Swiss-Prot record:
Region: Catalytic, residue numbers: 252-543
A Pfam match: TGS
Binding sites annotated in the UniProt record for Zn(2+): 344, 395, 520
GO CC terms: cytosol
Official protein name in the record: Threonine--tRNA ligase
Naturally occurring in which organism (per UniProt): Geobacter sulfurreducens (strain ATCC 51573 / DSM 12127 / PCA)
Enzyme class: ligase
Gene: thrS
């Protein structure tokens, strides 16, 4: 439609584009018409739009005075729309191939999409290939996608007549009197949208895996068949993502944990409980020792609390009312106890054990505390989601005037630690929700301290309005690994609840009792989870200071065993974590095994090394260091490790 430069006439509408320019179109014009008025290329590329910030289909009519944005597959919002529409395409293919399948929900998620189906027989990998092939046929058919609005009663009748009882259940729970549906050929689905104009816009997709999922996430409900997939704007982006997925499979911490003999799980022990093998336990110990050193450097006091505490204490803290479904309980001599799911309460007791003065503050209590949480079996995942884990928990108790400096100190701590491990990270501030406790002054002070620390950090951050806990605002810190995946690790959480519930006080300069400000914080979070992330980040190739085994002594033949044994003892007694392989095997075989175990250095002992009293360190990538005395290698290792100790 042509642009009018003289202004609107009766029946025209005026809309504003993101750059501030205006367009005048005839009344009843749609998002697609607006795109066409700008250019034929944009009209062809348009997949959806935004009217006053609300996403709509390209067929949505424009309103006078609206601010309008055209969404293409290159837009920030475009990928989610592509993925959501591709989930509908998958559901259509499933219904054609498996007519008795019942459809449930199929949202876009961070890495793609999924759809849950109620099927008589779980899908096989061969079924997955058939579904994907049918999706390609439907995409090539260029089937228009059309939006339809029905009353709730009409929609219930439609889906009930189709035998789609899950959709009926969803609709009946909706508060709206009308609902929107999307049709593409013989398939119809309940959805708010928006969606692609036609199936031909689904150009690059792949079904990736099968899984089970309970309806509404409730184990009491029926197990459904979940199909995962992903979609992108073009094949190049899809191929790059699929290669990343293959690399992630090679780095899977569960796979490497077995291959490197770090840890295991056993049905005899129970799901979600890790058994640490010698090398895994050493890795964990190194990490925990690192944590203790770093905390002591920064003025934290190391404390240790018991594993079980009286049920009355959990009732007093509020955990019993709000968290007991995730707790384990036991009884001792008729007295109820709760196994701790977090470490806060012992720290409260330490604070209350004596009268505190403002001169004592800030107090920083740090504990590598093992906790137990009842996680559903369906969400357990290697080290990343377990039922027993250790957290690097700390609680800072300070005066209101000290809060700013304490928050900045924690962010500086996080920055230092993430730098040591080579992680980039993102920060998010979650602010006061509608339902909260604490005064306006408390919230303003705490939020201001968190926000000020974020600004002073010089790093980008996001604000999640209203997403804080009811008892205080927080900063969440998410690290990015070598595959650009995000992982939640550090948290800085202000808490107005526990100091009140436990009547924590200090005496100020005027002799009056005041309530301290409390900050919960973790740096690495769950040690188990962080180790899982480390394994995948480094692909098992841990840096020298963190490697459970730093070197292995290899003999070429049996003749070198006496000298090789001396080398081994020299390294071991001087603190190098060393193994030996004196087996009567070919050297190439032993080197290959050491490389598969990802040991940083191999010390090959042949006749030349015996004669010269040296070792020739070979790095795991195949490169060699110059020959050196065993004592020189010890010094080399210690110098490398000292940088992190």
């Amino acid at each position: 439609m042509p642009l009018s430069v003289k202004g609107p006439v009766m029946g025209d509408i005026r809309v504003t584009l993101p750059d501030g320019s205006e367009r005048i179109l005839a009344e009843g014009a749609t998002v697609r018409d607006l795109a066409a008025s700008i250019g034929a290329g944009l009209a062809k590329a348009a997949i959806a739009g935004k009217i006053d910030g609300v996403q709509v289909d390209v067929t949505a009519p424009l309103t006078d005075g609206a601010r309008v944005e055209i969404i293409t597959d290159k837009s920030a919002d475009g990928l989610d729309i592509i993925r959501h529409s591709t989930s509908h395409l998958m559901a259509q293919a499933v219904k054609q191939l498996f007519p008795t399948a019942k459809v449930t929900i199929g949202p876009a998620v961070e890495t793609g999409f999924y759809y849950d189906f109620d099927v008589e027989t779980p899908f096989s990998p061969e079924d997955l290939a058939r579904i994907e092939e049918r999706m390609r046929e439907l995409a090539k058919a260029d089937i228009p996608v059309e939006r339809q609005v029905l009353s709730r009663d009409e929609a219930v009748k439609l889906f009930r007549d189709m035998g789609e009882e899950y959709k009926v259940e969803i609709i009946e729970a909706l508060p709206e009197e009308s609902v929107s549906l999307y049709r593409q050929g013989d398939f119809v689905d309940l959805c708010r949208g928006p969606h692609l104009p036609s199936t031909s816009f689904c150009r690059a997709f792949k079904l990736t895996s099968l899984a089970g999922a309970y309806w509404r996430g409730d184990e009491k409900n029926k197990m459904l068949q979940r199909v995962y997939g992903t979609a992108f704007a073009d094949k190049k982006e899809l191929d790059a993502y699929l290669e990343k997925i293959e690399e992630a499979k090679r780095r899977d911490h569960r796979k490497l944990g077995r291959e490197l003999d770090l840890f295991s799980f056993s049905d005899d022990v129970g799901a979600g409980f890790v058994i640490w093998h010698p090398k895994g336990a050493m890795l964990r110990t190194l990490l925990e020792d690192f944590e203790r050193r770093e905390h002591l450097k920064r003025g934290y006091d190391i404390v240790v609390g018991p594993q079980i505490l009286k049920t009355e204490l959990w009732q007093r803290s509020g955990h019993y009312d709000n968290y007991r479904e995730n707790m384990y309980f036991t009884e001792v001599e008729g007295q109820g106890f709760g196994i701790k799911p977090m470490n806060c309460l012992s720290h409260m007791m330490i604070y209350k054990s004596q009268l505190r003065s403002y001169r004592d503050l800030p107090l920083r209590f740090f504990e590598l505390g093992t906790v137990h949480r009842h996680e559903r079996a369906g969400v357990l995942h290697g080290l990343l989601r377990v039922r027993c884990f250790t957290q690097d928990d700390a609680h800072i108790l300070c005066t209101p005037e000290q809060l700013d400096a304490e928050i900045k100190g924690v962010i500086s701590f996080v920055n230092d630690v993430m730098g040591i491990f080579g992680f980039d990270y993102e920060m998010e501030l979650s602010t006061r929700p509608e339902k909260s406790i604490g005064s306006d002054e408390d919230w303003e002070r705490a939020t201001g301290a968190l926000l000020g620390a974020l600004k002073d950090s010089g790093r980008p951050y996001e604000i999640n309005e209203g997403d804080g806990a009811f008892y205080g605002p927080k900063i969440d810190i998410k690290l990015r690994d070598s595959l650009d995946r995000k992982w939640q690790c550090a948290t800085i959480q202000c808490d107005f609840t526990l100091p009140e519930r436990f009547d924590l006080t200090y005496v100020d300069a005027d002799g009056e009792r005041k309530r301290p400000v409390m900050v919960h914080r973790v740096i690495l979070g769950s040690i188990e989870r962080f180790i899982g992330v480390l394994i995948e980040h480094f692909a098992g190739n841990f840096p020298l200071w963190l490697s459970p085994v730093q070197a292995i002594v290899l003999t070429v033949t049996d003749n070198q065993q006496p000298y090789a044994a001396q080398v081994f003892e020299t390294l071991r007694t001087n603190g190098v974590r060393v193994q030996k392989d004196f087996r009567n095997e070919k050297l190439g075989f032993k080197i290959r095994e050491a490389q598969l175990q990802k040991i940083p250095y191999m010390l090959v002992i042949g006749d030349k090394e015996v004669e010269s009293g040296t070792v020739t360190p070979r790095f795991r990538d195949g490169s060699n260091l110059a020959a050196m005395k065993p004592e020189e290698f010890v010094a080399f290792v210690n110098d490398e490790v000292k940088r992190f100790n």
